Amino acid sequence: MALAIGLCLGLGIPISLIIGAVIGYYFAGKYFKKQLKENPPITESQIRAMYQQMGRKPTEKQIKQIMATFKKNNK
């Protein structure tokens, strides 16, 4: 009887930890991708500032093109 309980605990706890780690990793990845999509690492105003620091005036087309590239790479 005591051997059966010990065996159940000895196998159940590590298996539960492994399953929990896999599920946690999956949901953390989904959450991270969602946050990147909602809050990109760079904004249009940052792109404009970068162009101005280089001494150039960006067109709206260039800014949209750079933002589209960032969104495409984040998928």
From Swiss-Prot:
InterPro entries: UPF0154
UniProt keyword annotation of Secreted present: no
Membrane topology: Single-pass membrane protein
Keyword Ion transport tagged: no
TM region positions: 5-27
GO cellular component terms, A-Z: membrane
Keywords: Membrane, Transmembrane, Transmembrane helix
Pfam families named among the record's database cross-references: UPF0154
Organism: Malacoplasma penetrans (strain HF-2)
Name by which UniProt lists this protein: UPF0154 protein MYPE400
Subcellular locations according to the entry: Membrane
Entry superkingdom: Bacteria
Family: Belongs to the UPF0154 family.
Disulfide bonds: none
